[in-house]
Amino acid sequence: MKTIIEPFRIKSVEPIRLTSRPERERLARAAGYNLFGLHSDDVLIDLLTDSGTGAMSSLQWAAVMQGDESYAGSPSFFRFEAAVQNLMPFKHIIPTHQGRAAEAILFSIFGGKGRRIPSNTHFDTTRGNIEASGATGDDLVIAEGKDPQNLHPFKGNMDLARLEAYLEAHHAEVPLVMITITNNAGGGQPVSLANIRAVADLAHRYGKPFVIDGCRFAENAWFIKTREEGQADRSIPEIVRDCFAVADGMTMSAKKDAFGNIGGWLALNDDDLAEEARGHLIRTEGFPTYGGLAGRDLDALAQGLVEIVDEDYLRYRIRTHQYIVERLDAMGVPVVKPAGGHAVFIDARAWLSHIPPLEYPGQALAVALYEIAGVRSCEIGTAMFGRQPDGSEKPAAMDLVRLAFPRRTYTQSHADYIVEAFEELAATKDALRGYRIVKEPKLMRHFTCRFEKL
């Protein structure tokens, strides 16, 4: 059959409150035109993030009921640990309440003033934790990854020549090398297995640990299977194990590719580093066999790790994004191509070319999409990444709007509604105005800053 259906049945539903455009315009204004400030029950289709917003399966809910809440040595932890190590062969699995907590622990060890940490592209919380430690995060994605229209199959790849030159120039300041799979800030683009191995080889040649931000490891493995030469006949678990076999550690938000509503982990091979990390964990998160999570959460994540590598699910998920990208591209909306793993990315800078980057075209598009259709999205551009360490403002490499799809939550009719919203937007986009920021915090401003229309 040509039609790819949702490979699940719906057992429980949550009603969506329908709102009018005047109501949404009032709500956006009251939130300072920051969509993070909206109440979720004022949103029709919530594509702000795919993190922790998906639907758990009946087997995950069953696993919740066997959760053991012992403070230390819970069997829930050991089931969780075994599920992680089945896919990621690390010696030490350190649970955290979500991915940014794992990052905070990692950079409390490896960060510090004067240090520099390369990656393909650091996402917002990673960069925030790096900078909070006093270090600097540098992005070394390939040139194709900065071109929304380029059809390179692995636009998340790290530029190996730039990485080698970087390690030569900054050897003393670099405590580790990272890579993010998939590359969220670059359009949800995948990293090839060959590139992961080559980055690991370079890091180890220069005596640096190699750490993977693995939030969307299963989606990345699907792209490896379907796009990389020699991988088509291999299973998703086999590909996942190969990706992590060359790494010295990983950070993980289990709110993405573990079907969790909460949770994460830091994984390490080095005994001394793991001991130091557990010390930070006990001080900030909890005992090492729960790490800020309830036992029921650990059991739900263990089951989620079994389900996330199912090929029928991955085929459906990736095809959903491809469908929307194809429809938008056909109507002339500039989108990041090829379609990413967890989201559809709109090139707001290209579509709203009359709005300069320092007037936040991505924010203008995101607000308009909410006001017109009730769809909440997220700006990934100058509002998120434009402020420099010295307080100055610089345009980001791209101004994107991300439509991040919660897992197993929306259906085909929701996808068609989103396409229809862009059809309506196309008729009025040239009248949209830019924004200025009137209030912002020092770190990760996009979460809580307030805007005014120009």
Curated annotation (Swiss-Prot):
Origin: domain of life: Bacteria
Enzyme class (EC, first level): lyase
N6-(pyridoxal phosphate)lysine modifications at: K256
Keywords carried by this UniProt record: Lyase, Pyridoxal phosphate, Tryptophan catabolism
Keyword DNA damage in record: no
Matching SUPFAM superfamilies: PLP-dependent transferases (SSF53383)
Entry's EC annotation: 4.1.99.1
CDD domains: Tnase_like
Gene3D superfamilies documented for this protein: Aspartate Aminotransferase, domain 1, Type I PLP-dependent aspartate aminotransferase-like (Major domain)
Cofactor: pyridoxal 5'-phosphate
Pathway annotation: Amino-acid degradation; L-tryptophan degradation via pyruvate pathway; indole and pyruvate from L-tryptophan: step 1/1
GO molecular function, one term: tryptophanase activity
Pfam families membership: Beta_elim_lyase
Catalytic activity, reaction form: L-tryptophan + H2O = indole + pyruvate + NH4(+)
Record-stated family: Belongs to the beta-eliminating lyase family.
NCBIfam families: PRK13238.1
Subunit structure and binding partners: Homotetramer.
Name the record gives this protein: Tryptophanase
Source organism: Rhodobacter capsulatus
Gene transcribed to yield this protein: tnaA
